[in-house]
Amino acid sequence: MTNLTRFSVAPLHTMTRRLADVASGRVAPDLVITGARVLSTYSERILRDRELWITGGRVAAVKPAGAHKALPSGFTIYDAAGGIIAPGLVDPHIHIESSMVTACAYAEAALLNGTTTIFCDSHEIGNVMDTAGVEAMLEDARQAPLSIFLTVPSTVPATSAALETAGGDLTPDKIAGLFDRWPEAVALGEKMDFVPVCMGDERSHAILAAALQRGRPVSGHVYGREFVAAYAASGVTDTHEAIDRDIADDLLDAGVWIFLRGGPPTTPWHSLPQAIRTITELGASHKRTAVCTDDRDADDLMLFGLDWVVREAVKAGMSPEQAWSMGSLHGATRFAMDGEIGGLGGGRRADLVLLDDGLKPQSTWYGGELVVDQGKITSLLDQALSQRYQYPKAAYATVKLPAQMKLTPELPAKACTVNAIKTALPGITLIHEKVAIKPANDWDTLFARHGLCFVAVIERHGKSAGNVAHGLLKDFGLKRGAVASSVGHDSHNIIVAGTNEADMQTAVAAIGAQQGGVCVVADGKVRAMVPLPIAGLLSDKRVTAVAEEVKLLKKEWAEAGCTIPYMGFNLIPLSVIPEIRITDKGLVLVPQMELAPLFE
């Protein structure tokens, strides 16, 4: 069987004579793709009547149609039948864990959608298992049929131990060690704590130094024009959060790459049309922009890959050639890999996609091997996907729950003010709403009148004696039962919301029994469950199986009445995004970085 990993193609310096011989026509290539139009990401043109000569998993040359007729015999021909051949897509910013599958399983969906290289920030598993989790995912990535590079998690935990309990703590020394041990650790992941960075926080700048002194670029995550100058001066050279025209202008002029994030319409990350308009209305060059996916669940990963983002960019005003370049060459260039990926120049990896006129991938080659043929995975890829990395035993034992816990608060019998968390689409920003309560008859009536339900966060790393924090959600819309998840960003404690204690207990118990997952419960029964036994974040199944589980989860989630999708629900504990959050330590007022009581 062909070794189908990033390492299956020999380094360029070992192949230059062979490539030159093939490009000159002295030696036959392994593969000739004929009858093609070639999308050049270098000139942003579609070159008609071309063919590609491929050898050893690399592009030897792009030639005029019919040039292969003068070659020595012994090569395979693939007829593109007039389709467009383009370089494989390069996603410059993703979190594999958001898809709830392993790196190997992720590869199947990526290749079906024409993505052949990704740059992954694995801070989710780092928050649970520290460096052991990051390195387990790197081992997984090395065996995957996909080129996966690491942007080392930079902000683990997202905030301080005073505000939440995380399973991991990636110190500057640990981050330096990851860079030194893993050549595929090519950059520092998104530095989310931009305020401490701009204020000169010692730990934050020690982490930046660990990357910069090794010549690694630094990825960012920033809101607010007032922070751009200090952030850029600290060495940050990309961000995926800029959708406002003014801050985008400032970032581009400060030399910061902008990754335009394209999320499906039903998710908190649906901002691409606005982001594209921001760039086009500025009249700015798109050469320092790329597109990325950031977060996708397994279902959306199958339907809304980076290819979908590229097509959405075209709808928003980019030319097809510009959009595909933003999805391939630009991401490669940002990480100084444009000599290897992102285009079809001689010597580049033969990571190719056959497109129809609507830029929909039909077939994919990875390192010169056909892995998707007319929308179906080949037997070669199927075999590679079946040889999955086995995560260590510790990864299957990360949910440590207290023997007993109360998931609903004691409700006051007298008038009070509730510090409620008001949810609203798209679900990223949560509003701090003070609700005045004057108990008259019973709390059930008051809950209905004010649109309230219970929420709790349970520490699950075994570090804080099973902390349980209580809160109340407003306008979450839950009509019955409970919903729960072990993917409570970023520390990934368990978050549960419900209308009653019993169903909330059932939901948390179901997650504990599976060592992680996302579930919907009603009338004491689990109606839908996506088990996530690896670090409480990942399934051990193929992506197609997980996608089906997620579809059922979404159906039951909607029927329960929830007004924000489950991925938005998972963000409720994320204590770095305004205005109010709940962690295992309690309610967090984000602007003040302080804890607040539930009742006043």
Swiss-Prot record:
CDD domains from the UniProt entry: AdeC
Keyword tags: Hydrolase, Manganese
InterPro entries attached to this UniProt entry: Adenine_deam, Adenine_deam_C, Amidohydro-rel, Metal-dep_hydrolase_composite, Metal_Hydrolase
Enzyme Commission identifier(s): 3.5.4.2
Required co-factors: Mn(2+)
SUPFAM superfamilies: Composite domain of metallo-dependent hydrolases, Metallo-dependent hydrolases
Keyword Manganese assigned: yes
Gene Ontology terms, MF aspect: adenine deaminase activity
One Pfam family hit: Amidohydro_1
Gene Ontology terms: biological process: adenine catabolic process
Reaction catalyzed: adenine + H2O + H(+) = hypoxanthine + NH4(+)
Family affiliation: Belongs to the metallo-dependent hydrolases superfamily. Adenine deaminase family.
Protein name: Adenine deaminase 2
The species this protein was found in: Bradyrhizobium sp. (strain ORS 278)
Primary gene name: ade2
